[in-house]
Amino acid sequence: MFSAGAESLLHQAREIQDEELKKFCSRICKLLQAEDLGPDTLDSLQRLFLIISATKYSRRLEKTCVDLLQATLGLPACPEQLQVLCAAILREMSPSDSLSLAWDHTQNSRQLSLVASVLLAQGDRNEEVRAVGQGVLRALESRQPEGPSLRHLLPVMAKVVVLSPGTLQEDQATLLSKRLVDWLRYASLQQGLPHSGGFFSTPRARQPGPVTEVDGAVATDFFTVLSSGHRFTDDQWLNVQAFSMLRAWLLHSGPEGPGTLDTDDRSEQEGSTLSVISATSSAGRLLPPRERLREVAFEYCQRLIEQSNRRALRKGDSDLQKACLVEAVLVLDVLCRQDPSFLYRSLSCLKALHGRVRGDPASVRVLLPLAHFFLSHGEAAAVDSEAVYQHLFTRIPVEQFHSPMLAFEFIQFCRDNLHLFSGHLSTLRLSFPNLFKFLAWNSPPLTSEFVALLPALVDAGTALEMLHALLDLPCLTAVLDLQLRSAPAASERPLWDTSLRAPSCLEAFRDPQFQGLFQYLLRPKASGATERLAPLHQLLQPMAGCARVAQCAQAVPTLLQAFFSAVTQVADGSLINQLALLLLGRSDSLYPAPGYAAGVHSVLSSQFLALCTLKPSLVVELARDLLEFLGSVNGLCSRASLVTSVVWAIGEYLSVTYDRRCTVEQINKFFEALEALLFEVTQCRPSAALPRCPPQVVTVLMTTLTKLASRSQDLIPRASLLLSKMRTLAHSPATSSTHSEEGAEAIRTRATELLTLLKMPSVAQFVLTPSTEVCSPRYHRDANTALPLALRTVSRLVEREAGLMPG
């Protein structure tokens, strides 16, 4: 969330029109052409970067301005801040045909890194990625003493390796592996020299001290990213940079492709998961560069795990410890996949690490890579995978649902490891109520992730309970908010809407009378039962205005679409019936968040039709329930889309064409129910409490009644009389208060068309209840048999008959 000032600046940047931007660019061009690039230039470039980065679409800059930005980026004496801004602006414009940066003419390593970042943002248009990679390698080979340091180039190299793994040749990969070994293992243990204090500084004050551990002890082992000091030397910075790119290098550096196992000199290990002999120290023999790098990477990760046991003196170091643990476990996982001998050597320390961090809420992010490691190597590692699953899915979502970063990483972990769940997929599926806590609290950023995950979560056994949970998701958001508000004060409370005051909701949350409903909503696993949460909807109505609840409500329609797309792949006939009944039953039992019901009803109406298409006999099998649903007009206008879909489905599928069990008695019952419903709809007058009924409801009701009459011809006189009344009613002035002029015209036209059809019952049945053959594409392509031809023929016959009648 941005502050009010930041939001205001972003809004202003987005509102700037192209003409204003053009004038501003002209001013920047004058500043960049001046000899002195002062504070005005810096301020203007900052504003330009904000303008072009604040919008989703690309802003077009004048070619003169782009050329000057590129020229400024290449100036040797240009201030670093200006060059960083020029590179950032050019990256925002990428990919662009107007960029023409020259990589070969850049000598300074800092400038090389900035130019490379722009070229890589361009994409691999003219093999820029390969050119950048080769340029970085030449700089690394030159061992240039001048310039800030080679450390500016390592992030570029890491990006090149990921974007184009085949860029490096074997000898180049070997060279960089050797350099990485040196940087990782042999960085200095002395701090960097301080800046000169001038004439009055003493030589003793300028002597560098040793680096320390995070707890203040003097470091006695090799330097790592967790070593502390006031100033770092260049080789220490290179150590940090090397570790940051280590995992990407191990995965992508081989010429044979990403993640390929290196089997050189390891034929004796083929077919073996663990090799005690290979796990012994390799110090006694000279290893090839790639294997030597793996050995050093393993030692580095082991040292990081040991350093993470130390009690950090500063909070920043404590956070760094956890971040380094995550990366160390990920690197160890790569090493064990590439060389199984590392698995035997890693297990003891990783099991100890898992036992230490599983009870520490502050280290919860470390559990995800640890769980991935144990699940990946579970059989060989002799780890109880079920225990790992249970702890992961039971405790973490309950305790950490309010952490946005962890929520994203947790759902990403579930998506990335679906292939590892295999026999434990039921554990994941049963844990969906806990996973939905992440979704309820972080719905905007997690919606797309859950849309991708839902197909794996949906199961025939829990589909109904999951649909209830999705419909109650905004209610869950409100309850999670209350849970945090009622918890004891914590040192780091998550953010909520402080402007919202809901004392009655807090009292209800603590009331033992409602504890059962609240506990059901907060359940950690699928219970196999469903609870009617309508009482909670009323109790929590004051929370409906909460911004987080509103955001969650906006995400539910998208999630419902994904759910139905998945459930229809696994649903049998019985489940389809239950889903249809659930749609009808929950249509008037939704949390009263603003605009929520309208969005949900739109999805439910389309999905009800999809279920009927999937199983046309649904209408006959659920005849009694559909009649009950249609028996009440209460809330019809608020559920107009769903009512329209139900009525249309009755007219389409209540026929012996789709189900031989359909009887004339059923058709008559539905006709009477729909006739009564149409009468009540047309008699209701809109008011503040009862909104205007859409004309689509009336036209679909008339069409369905006509369809039913064509299938039970005893009903034709009643249907004709009803349609005549509707046509007359549409002409009356009273209709103007109920429907707009366009709506009344639509009703009048539809009534006239249907009356015309009913004058020839056999043709009406042909048109309104076509056989399977008539529905085939031939009837819509062949001019001699097309349905429009049949309709035109009927119209002419009826007109001729009307002309012969005495006036």
UniProtKB/Swiss-Prot annotation:
GO biological process, one term: axon development
Subcellular location: Cytoplasm; Nucleus
GO cellular component: AP-5 adaptor complex; AP-type membrane coat adaptor complex; cytoplasm; late endosome; lysosome; nuclear speck; nucleoplasm; nucleus
Predominant subcellular localization, coarse grouping: cytoplasm
Gene3D superfamilies: Leucine-rich Repeat Variant
Domain of life: Eukaryota
Pfam families: SPG48 (PF14764), TPR_AP5Z1 (PF25153), TPR_AP5Z1_C (PF25154)
Keywords of the record: Cytoplasm, DNA damage, DNA repair, Hereditary spastic paraplegia, Neurodegeneration, Nucleus, Protein transport, Transport
UniProt KW DNA damage keyword: yes
InterPro entries referenced in this protein's UniProt entry, alphabetically: AP5Z1, AP5Z1_ARM, ARM-like, TPR_AP5Z1_C, TPR_AP5Z1_N
Keyword Mitochondrion carried by entry: no
PANTHER family per the UniProt record, alphabetical: AP-5 COMPLEX SUBUNIT ZETA-1
Involvement in disease: Spastic paraplegia 48, autosomal recessive: A form of spastic paraplegia, a neurodegenerative disorder characterized by a slow, gradual, progressive weakness and spasticity of the lower limbs. Rate of progression and the severity of symptoms are quite variable. Initial symptoms may include difficulty with balance, weakness and stiffness in the legs, muscle spasms, and dragging the toes when walking. In some forms of the disorder, bladder symptoms (such as incontinence) may appear, or the weakness and stiffness may spread to other parts of the body.
Subunit structure: Probably part of the adaptor protein complex 5 (AP-5) a tetramer composed of AP5B1, AP5M1, AP5S1 and AP5Z1. Interacts with ZFYVE26 and SPG11.
Functional description taken from the UniProt entry: As part of AP-5, a probable fifth adaptor protein complex it may be involved in endosomal transport. According to PubMed:20613862 it is a putative helicase required for efficient homologous recombination DNA double-strand break repair.
Record's protein name: AP-5 complex subunit zeta-1
Species annotation: Homo sapiens (Human)
